[in-house]
Swiss-Prot record:
The glycine cleavage system catalyzes the degradation of glycine. The H protein shuttles the methylamine group of glycine from the P protein to the T protein. Pfam families: GCV_H (PF01597). Keywords: Lipoyl. The modification N6-lipoyllysine is found at residue 65. Its cofactor is (R)-lipoate. GO terms for cellular component: cytosol; glycine cleavage complex. The glycine cleavage system is composed of four proteins: P, T, L and H. This is Glycine cleavage system H protein. Transmembrane segments: none annotated. Residues 24-106 form the Lipoyl-binding domain. It comes from Thermosynechococcus vestitus (strain NIES-2133 / IAM M-273 / BP-1). HAMAP family: GcvH (MF_00272).
Length: 127
C-alpha cells in the first residue's frame, strides 16, 4: 500500500499532522502512524474547552498492536473534538487526513519543528 502525505499539511516527527487555517489547527495522525498501529480500536480525546500545552499528553489511541499516547505539538484551547472517531475509531484508518481528524484547536502557541510533506516522507521512508 502506498502511503500518502498531503502537501497542504505540516507534519511532526512524532507522526501527527496539523492543518493550520488562521489561528485554528486541525490535528490528526499520519497515514504512516495508522499503518504502524494496525487496527485502531479505541480513542480517548480531550473535551472541548480543555487547554493543551506543547509536549503534554492530550489523548490515547489504542490498536490491536499497541497503546500510544498523543502529545500536543502546540498550545491552545480545544474548540472541537471528532466524536465520529471516538464512536468509530476505524474512521481514522479509513480517512486519516479527512474524516479521521482528532481535534481542532484555537492556537495560542505555534509548534516548532514542523516538517513539509517531502521532509516527512523522507523521514519515514528512511531517505
Amino acid at each position: 500500500m502506498t502511503l500518502t502525505y498531503p502537501e497542504d499539511l505540516q507534519y511532526l516527527d512524532s507522526h501527527e499532522y496539523l492543518r493550520l487555517e488562521g489561528d485554528t489547527a486541525t490535528l490528526g495522525i499520519s497515514a504512516f502512524a495508522v499503518d504502524q498501529l494496525g487496527d485502531i480500536v479505541f480513542v480517548e480525546l480531550p473535551a472541548v474547552g480543555d487547554a493543551l500545552e506543547p509536549g503534554e499528553r492530550f489523548g490515547t489511541i489504542e490498536s490491536v498492536k499497541a497503546v500510544e499516547d498523543l502529545y500536543a505539538p502546540l498550545g491552545g484551547t480545544v474548540i472541537a473534538v471528532n466524536q465520529a472517531v471516538i464512536d468509530n475509531p476505524e474512521q481514522i484508518a479509513a480517512d486519516p487526513y479527512g474524516e479521521g481528524w482528532l481535534v481542532k484547536v484555537q492556537v495560542s502557541t505555534l509548534p516548532t519543528g514542523l516538517l513539509s510533506a517531502a521532509d516527512y516522507r523522507a523521514l519515514v521512508e528512511g531517505s
